[in-house]
């Protein structure tokens, strides 16, 4: 009998914690109905690099600097509350204009710990907007770690203009869109591109 009561009590506690977690990620709309908050994550690869300066850790090229300014113009009105970058000159420089505009200090993450970054974003920034600058081999795995399906199969070495957006809410599948930004983007509007595996 005691084990039955303990099991019931454990289930009630877990259920209560689950409801509390759901309530923490819900907001009340003007009509009085609770709605899930949407977490928005913008992901971009660093802008064009100047490989003639330092092959191991290059700075941005002139075109890359133009793209970094375009990123600032595009995302400053989205009011991000957190910015994430890897610890390279090119990713930091891509994020620098936006960071200055929104007065946020970029947080450095380990590109080998993508899952940990996704967990941190979900836990610490639920219902908010964040920006992540990464690399051609880290963005798609991060989209997957956030629960989405990458809209492209790969990012080639000469592709710098993708702006991925992942929107997540409790109880809903993430919505992933992609658009181009900066000089001569290939995609000009948010385009949901479902990819069949």
PLM feature spans:
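Positively charged n-region of N-terminal signal peptides that target proteins for export
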Residues: 1-7
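Signal peptide processing junction and immediate N-terminal pro/mature segment
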Residues: 21-29
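Bacterial N-terminal signal peptides
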Residues: 9-20
């Amino acid at each position: 009998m005691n084990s039955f009561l303990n099991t019931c009590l454990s289930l009630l506690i877990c259920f209560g914690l689950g409801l509390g977690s759901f309530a923490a990620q819900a907001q009340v709309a003007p009509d009085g109905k609770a709605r899930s908050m949407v977490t928005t994550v913008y992901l971009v690869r660093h802008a064009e690099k100047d490989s003639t300066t330092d092959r191991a850790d290059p700075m941005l090229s002139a075109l890359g600097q133009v793209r970094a300014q375009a990123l600032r113009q595009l995302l400053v009105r989205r009011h991000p509350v957190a910015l994430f970058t890897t610890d390279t000159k090119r990713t930091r420089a891509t994020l620098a204009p936006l960071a200055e505009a929104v007065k946020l200090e970029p947080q450095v993450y380990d590109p080998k710990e993508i899952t940990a970054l996704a967990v941190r974003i979900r836990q610490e920034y639920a219902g908010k907007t964040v920006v992540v600058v990464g690399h051609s081999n880290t963005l798609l795995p991060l989209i997957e770690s956030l629960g989405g399906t990458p809209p492209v199969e790969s990012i080639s070495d000469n592709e710098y203009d993708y702006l991925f957006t992942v929107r997540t809410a409790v109880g809903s599948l993430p919505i992933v869109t992609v658009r181009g930004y900066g000089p001569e983007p290939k995609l000009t509007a948010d385009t949901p591109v479902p990819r069949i595996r």
